[in-house]
């Protein structure tokens, strides 16, 4: 019987959860779910100078917001240092690794010699077969792996295929430093083995690491997990995605106003596809996702595509769910605090009532919040430039006879208001737009908004008439 699939996401808490890391986590999560397995979380916090608790919290928060739940407790790599030392010493005891007492001066001499001879700098193995009794007094050694010197190390990769590394290019690298701390290369192997990880899905910038890690697995006689090294995300210009392209942390995408489901949908299509399907539910992603279908070529991040997908998700969202998502993000967006303060019982009811019209025009929650500001604006309304031009003398003259029509309304519904204004326009020999444009400007202070009859209903009779009255004098 085959082992259950166990994947892992292993971020370093030296900053936010960046978008590439989020995609890696998503691929690990989807593959584990697809196979009925587990995704574990390990925080690679061995770099004590750069690792912070705030970054760890931001990573956990980002994963939770994206809906990527992990199995069990998050594991700290730093706390496992005694186990890393134990395995390093075991490798020495078994003749698979050795103590190296080379001084910094000797190592620099090796590098200089290699440079002079046009070779890449490599440790020359001078302590590989020497007796530790020859060790200089008072020098704390490092532990180096005894890497094979002939042949090649092959990484069997589900995405890249078999990748071969000549062993002459892989020197006896350090697995334990002289202060007893493990190197990243060593700690990762020990942790993945002890956690029972069967499948490693990570960026292809780790491919060279995979060769060295395979040497450690083989030295310990452990099974090597199935590797899948996925292409990095590039910007629209084809260069590796960076801050220059607007590469942000997941927390920033949240504050910009993207929905987690939309971001998941966009990220899964960066380097993986299922036919021509663009929009897919989480259940479909889980059913269809397989590492063998990941592309070898780098995917390009397209903000406009993400925005379009987010808009689709917003339009198809339940009004209450979208309302809740907007309220949750208000503290993080510009002007959101003022909007949140306006959401008393009446304000909440108005915003929910406006949601069908607002979500048709917005691609992000920030745009949704901006579109909703007219509901809570103080009188007299500040007019934007286009609204002011619509409320010139001609616009006000068109609007003046509309006021008594609205004032006389018995039923204040979108349908009855639509019928009354259309009848008035016909009687005046005007097109509906000739009335609707200055009316919208008077009600919202803007030239664009949800449907003008929906706006009248959301604002209510009293507020609508008061705003129109402010403009016609």
UniProtKB/Swiss-Prot annotation:
**What is this enzyme's EC?**
6.1.1.17
Chain span(s) of sequence motif 'HIGH' region: 11-21
Would the keyword ATP-binding turn up in this protein's UniProt record? yes
Q: Which reaction is this enzyme known to catalyze?
A: tRNA(Glu) + L-glutamate + ATP = L-glutamyl-tRNA(Glu) + AMP + diphosphate
- What are the entry keywords? Aminoacyl-tRNA synthetase, ATP-binding, Cytoplasm, Ligase, Nucleotide-binding, Protein biosynthesis
Which PROSITE patterns does its entry note? AA_TRNA_LIGASE_I (PS00178)
Task: Give the NCBIfam families listed for this entry.
Answer: gltX_bact
Q: What is this protein called?
A: Glutamate--tRNA ligase 1
Q: Which organism is it from?
A: Brucella melitensis biotype 1 (strain ATCC 23456 / CCUG 17765 / NCTC 10094 / 16M)
Q: What is the lineage of its organism?
A: Bacteria, Pseudomonadati, Pseudomonadota, Alphaproteobacteria, Hyphomicrobiales
